[in-house]
UniProtKB/Swiss-Prot annotation:
Catalyzes the interconversion of methylthioribose-1-phosphate (MTR-1-P) into methylthioribulose-1-phosphate (MTRu-1-P). It comes from the Eukaryota. The gene is MRI1. It is an enzyme of class 5 (isomerase). Keywords: Amino-acid biosynthesis, Cytoplasm, Isomerase, Methionine biosynthesis, Nucleus. It catalyses: 5-(methylsulfanyl)-alpha-D-ribose 1-phosphate = 5-(methylsulfanyl)-D-ribulose 1-phosphate. This is Methylthioribose-1-phosphate isomerase. The active site is at residue 252. It is found in: Cytoplasm; Nucleus. Its EC number is 5.3.1.23. Pathway: Amino-acid biosynthesis; L-methionine biosynthesis via salvage pathway; L-methionine from S-methyl-5-thio-alpha-D-ribose 1-phosphate: step 1/6. It comes from Yarrowia lipolytica (strain CLIB 122 / E 150) (Yeast). Gene3D superfamilies: translation initiation factor eif-2b, domain 1, Translation initiation factor eif-2b, domain 2.
């Protein structure tokens, strides 16, 4: 059974999330009581992963509409609609790179604008749509796993010849980054379930260590054969291990031409895949495809605090929280959270609707998205 990082009680409208800052040493669920809690959880990376961020943001507002005390079904529809729209705009400021959040905000603002009826009916419509968003994400991820498995079995030589393959991945793209199952890690789960996976190699993903803290946690939990490596070992690993047939990454934003923003380090993996002639695929829901942004150069890249690079958090021998400084005091730091893989180095983009591939060396994601 895969992990459940988001727990939403539809009947009582309560939300708790697994505190990912405490993983892998502690598994603690924290309550999200309103949109302020949601914003802080996203900003502080208590929850992370583009799909999960959007889901927690919307559900945090759903909880607030029921329990927050700032809005009432006795108010006018205009007052409730204005409150929801203002809170959505606020939530959208928590993390700017992930398109899922801005898309969800836009979708729910449209619901506010188009839903007719009373304030109570508007609140009910919001609650229903937010719960559906949670349920749909799990099924979407399983579909991504299915389509990714099929593509790999046809296009990765070892798998096409009936042999097991190994895969390389970065960051965390599993149940901890989504409503469940995962995107890139969902494909890896599908490979494992089908008996196709020999081993997955997970990059530690500095400086926040989502690979060593979160992906490794999921892989151990699910009993998937896995090996953890540092980010700087990727080239040596690919040169040594010929059985690694595919690199699978997630996406925070896929733009019109196919350039894909993802965790810092993704760009170098796309270069390595090209150099070593390995397949490089992106796993993302269609909600992560942003056809309004033309290329990777137009993506706003979030920069994180310097302290995330100069200090490391963990626990001591007694499992007490511990923060250790690992850099020379006074050193300047550049700490972008993301980079982007250019579309020319991407073999396929796997979504819940199917697989987008290049024709004549170009992706046509506008047509792909509209057709699906």
């Amino acid at each position: 059974m895969s992990l459940e990082a988001i727990r939403y009680d539809e009947k009582n409208h309560t939300l708790t999330i697994l505190d990912q800052l405490r993983l892998p040493h502690e598994s603690e669920y924290v309550p999200i009581n309103n949109s302020d809690d949601g914003w802080k959880a996203i900003k502080d990376m208590v929850v992370r992963g583009a799909p999960a961020i959007a889901i927690v943001a919307i559900l945090s507002l759903a909880v607030e509409l029921v329990h927050g005390g700032k809005v009432s079904r006795d108010q006018t529809r205009a007052e409730v609609g204005s409150f929801i729209s203002d809170r959505l705009d606020y939530l959208n400021t928590s993390r700017p790179t992930a398109v899922n959040l801005s898309d969800a905000v836009g979708s729910f603002k449209k619901l506010v604008q188009t839903q007719t009826g009373s304030a109570s009916e508007l609140i009910e419509a919001f609650l229903s749509a937010s719960h559906k968003m949670l349920l749909d994400d799990v099924q979407d991820n399983k579909n991504i796993g299915k389509y990714g498995l099929e593509w790999i079995q046809k296009n990765v030589p070892q798998a096409a010849n009936g042999h097991k393959i190994s895969a390389l991945t970065i960051c965390n793209t599993g149940s901890l980054a989504t409503a469940g199952y995962g995107t890139a890690l969902g494909i890896i789960r599908a490979l494992h379930e089908a008996g196709v996976l020999e081993r997955v190699y997970a990059l530690e993903t500095r400086p926040y260590n989502q690979g060593s803290r979160l992906t490794a946690y999921e892989l151990v939990h699910d009993g998937i054969p896995a090996t953890l490596v540092t980010d700087s070992m990727a080239a040596a690993l690919l040169r040594k291990n010929k059985d690694i047939g595919v690199i699978i990454v997630g996406a925070d934003r896929v733009v019109l031409n196919g350039d894909t923003a993802n965790k810092i380090g993704t760009f170098q993996l796309s270069i390595l895949a090209n150099h070593f002639d390995r397949k490089f695929i992106v796993a993302a829901p269609t909600t992560s495809i942003d056809v309004q942004t033309k290329s990777g150069e137009d993506i706003e890249i979030e920069e994180r605090p310097a302290i995330e690079l100069t200090q490391v958090k963990g626990v001591d021998a007694n499992k007490q929280p511990l923060t250790v400084s690992v850099a020379a005091p006074g050193i300047e730091v550049w700490n972008p959270a993301f980079d982007y893989a250019p579309y020319k180095l991407i073999d396929a983009i796997v979504t819940e609707k199917g697989v987008a591939e290049k024709t004549g060396g170009e992706f046509n994601l506008k047509e792909f998205k509209s057709a699906n």
